[in-house]
């Protein structure tokens, strides 16, 4: 048996944060399985607890700390491993309940780090690199995922943007793109295992290839050629990648899902400038218009921050008006979270929490109205749905999956349709699941 363990040890993992983190957690789980560990649910007793942390907001920091303490409380004798963005950004300031700290570019070495820890008679172990100088992509691979129909594939790490509110470039380092052929190998493996949809994801997906002379468009076109894959979906994109060439080129690919998450953050130019977002609201709207030019009724989704430092009532109203005019399918609202070490953290005119909450509630209500309007346009249409699971409701059993636009749809039947593509006529709003 590989690895350090003579007896089969139990390991439990918990993921916090984005799809990139989720991918890395699944890759670490595979490493543990390959080296003789038994994977158990986090709520069960384990010999090793691994928490992949997040630091995107203060709430994420708090949840990360809570999970680390929960692991220690569940088994005081267990090895508690902290990895991910929270520990990378915090450096040496890590809670004493943690036995091992693994930086964001050392996750592939998890087994060796555990071996060394045990061989060193349980001395506290820290594996943190100065990630800002890291130039190599950390190659990890997933052959199966928690979902049995859709697989997320990490193709890129790091970010060079340095938006004034964001701590992630400090936790993830500069842009590093995965070898294109390695991505294709993983897609082929997943296709052979029966996965029908792949989602290309990264910390700053739009930057894929800027360090290797390749491009995201080239990667999409290569993935499209792989047999077995029926759908290609993209993670969050920067608006600037949506050019006439990009939109027209992906629109001719039958497997391409017309679901685009374009980060907005604010619809007010003055706020965007303070955020260092590098585009105007007008430019953003042009990108949305381009996508609607080449795709029929695409689902456009976004993120919006309310209560950014200096955001006046007039600026907020301008942002609300812009979101209203874009007609997003989904709008994810975040109250500005002050992150130490960022430019925004020391900006004047910080907004009180009660005002942030008021603005958040208004933006959420607007988002819900826009989502309802988009969904109502689907009534009477027939949509291709990738079935994923059975859901029991008061109205009976529904087989549930997602359209290419990522609208969750139910078909009332007891027949198991998991991982099948079915054309479903949407006759009632009850079929649209939230």
What are these language model-derived features?
Residues 80-81, 89, 192-313:
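Conserved SAM/AdoMet-binding glycine-rich loop
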Residues 21, 57-60, 87, 239, ...:
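Alpha-helix N-cap/loop-to-helix initiation residues
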Residues 18, 209-224, 228, 275, ...:
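Radical SAM enzyme [4Fe-4S]-AdoMet core and its adjacent flexible, acidic
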């Amino acid at each position: 048996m590989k690895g350090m363990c003579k007896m089969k040890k139990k390991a439990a993992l918990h993921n916090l944060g984005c799809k990139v983190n989720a991918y890395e957690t699944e890759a670490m789980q595979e490493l543990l399985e390959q080296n003789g560990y038994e994977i158990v649910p986090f709520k069960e007793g384990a010999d090793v607890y691994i928490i992949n942390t997040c630091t995107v907001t203060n709430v994420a920091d708090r949840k990360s700390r809570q999970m680390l303490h929960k692991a220690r409380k569940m088994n005081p004798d267990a090895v508690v491993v902290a990895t991910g963005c929270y520990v990378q950004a915090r450096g040496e300031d890590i809670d004493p309940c943690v036995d091992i700290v693994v930086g964001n570019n050392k996750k592939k070495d998890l087994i060796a780090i555990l071996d060394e820890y045990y061989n060193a008679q349980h001395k506290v172990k820290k594996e943190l690199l100065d990630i800002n100088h890291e130039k190599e992509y950390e190659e990890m691979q997933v052959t199966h995922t928690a979902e049995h129909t859709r697989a997320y594939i990490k193709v890129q790490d790091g970010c060079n943007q340095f938006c004034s509110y964001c701590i992630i470039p400090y936790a993830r380092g500069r842009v590093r793109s995965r070898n294109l052929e390695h991505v294709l190998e993983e897609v082929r493996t997943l296709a052979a295992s029966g996965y029908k949809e792949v989602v290309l994801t990264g910390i700053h997906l739009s930057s894929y290839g800027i360090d290797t002379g390749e491009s995201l468009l080239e990667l999409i076109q290569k993935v499209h050629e792989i047999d077995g894959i029926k759908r290609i979906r993209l993670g969050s994109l920067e608006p600037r990648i949506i050019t006439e060439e990009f939109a027209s080129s992906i629109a001719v690919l039958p497997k391409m899902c017309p679901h685009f998450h374009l980060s907005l953050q604010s619809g007010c130019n003055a706020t965007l400038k303070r955020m260092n977002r590098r585009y105007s609201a007008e430019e953003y709207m042009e990108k949305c218009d381009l996508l609607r030019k080449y795709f029929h009724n695409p689902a456009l989704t976004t993120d919006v921050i309310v209560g950014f430092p200096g955001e006046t009532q007039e600026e907020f109203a301008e942002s609300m008006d812009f979101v209203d005019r874009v007609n997003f399918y989904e709008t994810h609202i975040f109250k500005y979270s002050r992150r130490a070490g960022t430019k925004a953290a020391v900006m004047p005119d910080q907004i009180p929490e009660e005002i942030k909450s008021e603005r958040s509630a208004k933006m959420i209500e607007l988002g819900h109205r826009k989502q309802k309007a988009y969904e109502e346009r689907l009534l009477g249409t027939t949509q291709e749905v990738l079935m994923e699971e059975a859901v029991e409701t008061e109205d009976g059993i529904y087989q549930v999956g997602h359209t290419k636009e990522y609208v969750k749809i139910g078909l009332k039947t007891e027949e198991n349709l998991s991982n099948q593509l079915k054309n479903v006529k949407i006759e009632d709003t009850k079929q649209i699941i939230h």
